[in-house]
Amino acid sequence: PSHVRRKIMSWPLSKELRQKYSVRSMPIRKDDE
């Protein structure tokens, strides 16, 4: 769900999540991609 994704992207990502999603503290825009 997008709202869950926003909540997850609200806080700084851990190193694991950074590598997994290839992002830092930016929202993932898979919907746009």
UniProtKB/Swiss-Prot annotation:
Q: Which GO terms describe its molecular function?
A: structural constituent of ribosome
Disulfide pattern: none
Q: Where are the transmembrane segments?
A: none
Q: Where in or outside the cell? A: Cytoplasm
The source's domain of life comes to: Eukaryota
- One of its Pfam families is Ribosomal_L26
- Using the record, list the residue span of the signal peptide; answer none if the entry has no such feature: none
Which InterPro entries does this chain map to?
Rib_uL2_dom2 (IPR014722), Ribosomal_uL24_euk/arc (IPR005756), Translation_prot_SH3-like_sf (IPR008991)
What Gene3D superfamilies does the record tag this protein with? 2.30.30.30
GO terms, biological process: translation
Task performed by this protein: Component of the large ribosomal subunit. The ribosome is a large ribonucleoprotein complex responsible for the synthesis of proteins in the cell.
Q: How does it assemble?
A: Component of the large ribosomal subunit.
* PANTHER family xrefs: 60S RIBOSOMAL PROTEIN L26 FAMILY MEMBER (PTHR11143)
UniProt family annotation: Belongs to the universal ribosomal protein uL24 family.
Q: Know the name of this protein?
A: Large ribosomal subunit protein uL24
Q: Which gene specifies this protein's sequence?
A: rpl26
